[in-house]
Amino acid sequence: GYARFIEWFKNREDVENARRVANRDFDLQDVELRAVRDAVAALMPGFDTLRIDREVAPPAMVVTKGDVELRLDQLSDGERNLIALAGDLARRMAIANPGSDAPLETEGVILIDEIEQHLHPALHFTVIPSLQRAFPKAQLIVTTHSPQVLSSVPASAIVVLDGFDASPVTSPTRGRDTNAILREVFGVPARLPEQAQEVLDIVRLIDGDRLDEARTRLSNLAELLSEHDVDVLRLRTKIDFAAVGL
């Protein structure tokens, strides 16, 4: 958890500050802390200057997000968890490779269960590429139920687990629409059954040249789903084409 990470970081920063004073070198960086700072920067673009603020009681970890310095308890659970994850992995790699100038390039296997937990959906798209960037020589083995996470990796990197059965993914995933991934990988419909059936019914009305009824049903559906919904737009186009005999 991030509480233990903060305590470790504070202790290391105390050592780093003492060495800076003793060596009269205020650019000196503790190897383990440098690895943590580099990992956080790689995993969380826009975050910088991770440090302990000792002018408050008790001392608190702060980080610069954009142009604003924030305490860790002002961040979302997901942001705090990512900082703790990056810090813990980087710390372990630095400890395992004393004297290394590039501890984040340590080879190893990283296991993460339900990587999307507590993360804002926008971070689902970036968390895997960011981990790969932060720890380029580590093998990641993660579990997820997020179609956004799957859309950030190729199908060849995905295995579907169903009980004790494991099967490959045969349809493309990287860059795919998340509704397609829900349907093709998770086997979950993108819509509630009622709305999915209404879309099919409107298609049948159009194919049967019952355009006025199709327009009425589509207007009702658009009020529910919005005029910008992909199926609403598709059905409007289909009606327009049918009206001119195309």
What are these regions (language model features)?
Residues 1-43, 182, 197:
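Coupling/switch segment of ABC-type P-loop NTPase heads
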Residues 28-35, 81, 123, 194, ...:
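Soluble or luminal CAZymes and related metallo-dependent hydrolases
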Residues 31-36, 44-46, 62-73:
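Accessory N-terminal region flanking or inserted into the helicase ATPase core
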Residues 38-42, 91, 133, 223:
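A generic structural signal for well-ordered alpha-helical segments enriched in polar/charged residues
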Residues 45-48, 136, 154, 226:
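Proline-centered flexible-loop/turn and helix-kink motifs
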Residues 47-62:
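Long, charged, glycine-rich C-terminal linkers/tails
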Residues 58-190:
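Switch/communication elements of ASCE P-loop NTPase nucleotide-binding domains
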Residues 166, 170-246:
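Acidic, Mg2+-coordinating catalytic modules of nucleic-acid enzymes
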